[in-house]
Curated annotation (Swiss-Prot):
Residues 453-711 form the Protein kinase domain. InterPro entries: AGC-kinase_C, cGMP_dep_kinase, cNMP-bd_CS, cNMP-bd_dom, cNMP-bd_dom_sf, Kinase-like_dom_sf, Prot_kinase_dom, Protein_kinase_ATP_BS. ATP binds at L459, G460, V461, G462, G463, F464, G465, R466, V467, K482. It comes from Homo sapiens. Keywords: ATP-binding, Cell membrane, cGMP, cGMP-binding, Coiled coil, Disease variant, Dwarfism, Kinase, Lipoprotein, Membrane, Myristate, Nucleotide-binding, Phosphoprotein, Serine/threonine-protein kinase, Transferase. This is cGMP-dependent protein kinase 2.
Length: 762
């Protein structure tokens, strides 16, 4: 063809058929593949169903394994405890119920338990008290400006990042981190030197800036520390012994901060925040006449919300239940007016001004728009439900304020006079027997108590010293003598706590609190002559039984609740609840002992010293936010958990891990099956992360605990009258029967004299 085109040839299949056959073959192949695909789909579905069955079986087995593991752990604990007793007896194995060791068995064996069986006992810890009246070497008053150390911006950023990577420190407020960075100072170490030495007391937190560090326990290498990592943080919470050594492998540079400065920063920032919020609230006409304790609760409830320019904080016409205080930035107020299509500007509000206060009284239809005028506007917010639960409804407050406002001119001295009159009435209630005992021991020498007393046995030992069972010579009158080593008190800077314990116990008179009769002192010890409660420690019984049933736990919790009710009415916070600090009298009633961490605080006030037992401390204590009576309610929740299970809910391999578990909270924690629904609800409500939300700290106070469903039907009046039989009833052979206490070896040597004179008024 002239155009050069080529006529196409028809393709032929090798068998001579045309291309149509190829199409048929493809169709057949597709059909075959579709059939195969359906078969595979069916096979996959079958396998998925089988996999689902396996997963369900695995889930059931996992639950069963967890239950068996828990049961095995409990039985191992009980077996170890009983083997300790058998080993000391040199006899054949004891047969006892895994759930309950009879009191008679405890009575026969507890005196034979060696000291190492107390390894499970929890010890309290404490920082130096914030008021160190009796510390003759206390440092000068803290000055933030003097503590600041110059750094360039890049160093500040690196230190800030290092602190924020730490599991504990990242929970602090940004301002607290900023102040820590400002006050950290450089410390250089030569190759081969120790930054931290195992067994020595710690006082500093460090950030590694240059060089190489390695961590040792004994001679064993544990790890190395990366650059810009924080370490040693436990030492800034309280006086503790280092559990490992940190050695410089090269020359190193660190940034350091000591405990005293850290605690002053925490207290300074929190107090400044509270004071600012308090001033804001005092400017609100609705709230300005509320008493301090109510204002403090509102302050603790306030949350911070942030808005950017143009954001509507309140919209006109909407129903609202939230009250706002402007903490930072400016907002504009606009309102619909006749003759205008758009809302018109009414005014501008600035820091310290407030809006929406009517919402605290009743449902409020917003009468205007509130719009952020700039970025990063900060508002302090509280809603009506929170306000009503923690502070009270408007009607309740109105009734309260009528009496309060009528007495606004009454000064603090008159209020304290009223309280002291109340205390005088309490002192009148002292039994004749107690008055006679006080008169008897008042005649003893103040510096030589053992001229008139003889030691019968040791009831307990601790870092402070010992508690001895003593009796009056030639008389059948017994006491417990707490002997506190003066040198230990000075070394740990606990003079204030010892004096506080003395002062507080001297004014108390409750059947749920151990009584103090007299104090003494010599060159080596200060002494407290206490009521002898010889029913034994609750901790020892819990150790031997493994856990308590619900009726026994309820009785224990009720005794503690009555003790807290009495203390809190007097303005006293306890701060060290645990089974180790609960002791039984002859009738099996519990009494609080060891008031070393107790403190009297004013209404609506907070205290700042880190103290307590690690497994029992509340989050606000760990974070140095300041704390009040609500920490006792937190610890009550932990106690309920431990009584029912044998172990506290938060317990890590070291104290810092325990604190991090506490800060994560109890809300998402799975409870063991032995804790039923009602006690679980009580524990969760007592252990709220926010102190203002805790049961006992709401507007109805401790009555909310007494009326909780788990304690429904409990005979509170019988408990207070001591007519309610105790499930822990004891049988004592006489006033010096100490068979319910563990046996302790004699004290090795005598402590050195301590003659600084801090105890002159003891």
């Amino acid at each position: 063809m002239g155009n050069g085109s080529v006529k196409p040839k028809h393709s032929k299949h090798p068998d001579g058929h045309s291309g149509n056959l190829t199409t048929d073959a493809l169709r057949n192949k597709v059909t075959e593949l579709e059939r195969e695909l359906r078969r595979k789909d069916a096979e996959i579905q079958e396998r998925e169903y089988h996999l689902k069955e396996l997963r369900e079986q695995l889930s059931k087995q996992t639950v069963a394994i967890a239950e068996l593991t828990e049961e095995l752990q409990n039985k191992c604990i009980q077996l170890n405890k009983l083997q300790d007793v058998v080993h000391m007896q040199g006899g054949s194995p004891l047969q006892a119920s895994p759930d309950k060791v009879p009191l008679e068995v405890h009575r026969k064996t507890s005196g034979l338990v060696s000291l190492h069986s107390r390894r499970g006992a929890k010890a309290g810890v404490s920082a130096e008290p914030t008021t160190r009246t009796y510390d003759l070497n206390k440092p000068p008053e803290f000055s933030f400006e003097k503590a600041r150390v110059r750094k360039d911006s890049s160093e500040k950023k690196l230190i800030t990042d290092a602190l924020n990577k730490n599991q504990f420190l990242k929970r602090l407020d940004p301002q607290q981190i900023k102040d820590m960075v400002e006050c950290m100072y450089g410390r250089n170490y030569q190759q081969g030197s120790y930054i931290i030495k195992q067994g020595e007391p710690g006082n500093h937190i460090f950030v590694l800036a240059e060089g190489r560090l390695e961590v040792f326990q004994g001679e064993k290498l544990l790890s190395s520390i990366p650059m810009w990592t924080t370490f040693g943080e436990l030492a800034i919470l309280y006086n503790c012994t280092r559990t490992a050594s940190v050695k410089a492998i090269t020359n190193v540079k660190t940034w350091a901060l000591d405990r005293e400065v850290f605690q002053n920063i925490m207290r300074r920032t929190a107090q400044a925040r509270d004071e600012q919020y308090r001033n804001f609230l005092r400017s609100v006409s609705l709230l300005k006449n509320l008493p301090e304790d109510k204002l403090t609760k509102i302050i603790d409830c306030l949350e911070v919300e942030y808005y950017d320019k143009g954001d509507y904080i309140i919209r006109e016409g909407e129903e609202g239940s939230t009250f706002f205080i402007l903490a930072k930035g400016k907002v504009k107020v606009t309102q619909s007016t006749e003759g205008h299509d758009q809302p018109q500007l009414i005014k501008t509000l600035q820091k310290g001004e407030y809006f929406g206060e009517k919402a605290l009284i009743s449902d409020d239809v917003r009468s205007a728009n509130i719009i952020a005028e700039e970025n990063d506007v900060a508002c302090l917010v509280i809603d009506r439900e929170t306000f009503n639960q923690t502070v009270g409804t408007f009607e309740e407050l109105q009734k309260y304020l009528e009496g309060y406002v009528a007495n606004l001119n009454r000064d603090d001295e008159k209020r304290h006079a009223k309280r002291s009159m109340s205390n005088w009435k309490l002192s009148k209630a002292l039994s004749l027997e107690m008055i006679q005992l006080k008169e008897k021991v008042a005649r003893f020498s103040s510096s030589s108590p053992f001229q008139n007393l003889e030691i019968i046995a040791t009831l307990g030992v601790g870092g402070f010293g010992r508690v001895e069972l003593v009796k009056v010579k030639n008389e059948n009158v017994a006491f417990a003598m707490k002997c506190i080593r003066k040198k230990h008190i000075v070394d740990t800077k606990q003079q204030e706590h010892v004096y506080s314990e003395k002062r507080i116990l001297e004014e108390l008179c409750s059947p749920f609190i151990v009584k103090l009769y007299r104090t003494f002192k010599d060159n080596k010890y200060v002494y407290m002559l206490l009521e002898a409660c010889l029913g034994g420690e609750l901790w020892s019984i819990l150790r031997d039984r493994g856990s308590f049933d619900e009726p026994t736990s309820k009785f224990c919790v009720a005794c503690v609740t009555e003790a807290f009710d009495y203390l809190h009415r007097l303005g006293i916070i306890y701060r060290d609840l645990k089974p180790e600090n609960l002791i039984l009298d002859a009738e099996g009633y519990l009494k609080l002992v060891d008031f070393g961490f107790a403190k009297k605080i004013g209404s609506g006030q907070k205290t700042w010293t880190f103290c307590g037992t690690p497994e029992y401390v509340a989050p606000e204590v760990i974070l140095n936010k300041g704390h009040d009576f609500s920490v006792d309610f937190w610890s009550l929740g932990i106690l309920v958990y431990e009584l029912l299970t044998g172990n506290p809910p938060f317990s890590g391999v070291d104290q810092m891990m325990t604190y991090n578990l506490i800060l994560k909270g109890i809300e998402k924690m799975d409870f063991p099956r032995k804790i039923t629904r009602r006690p679980e609800d009580l524990i969760r409500r007592l252990c709220r992360q926010n102190p203002t939300e805790r049961l006992g700290n709401l507007k109805n106070g401790i009555n909310d605990i007494k009326k909780h469903r788990w304690l429904n039907g409990f005979n509170w009046e019988g408990l207070k009258a001591r007519s309610l039989p105790s499930p822990l009833q004891r049988e004592l052979k006489g006033p010096i029967d100490h068979s319910y206490f563990d046996k302790y070896p004699p004290e090795k040597g005598m402590p050195p004299d301590e003659l600084s004179g801090w105890d002159k008024d003891f």
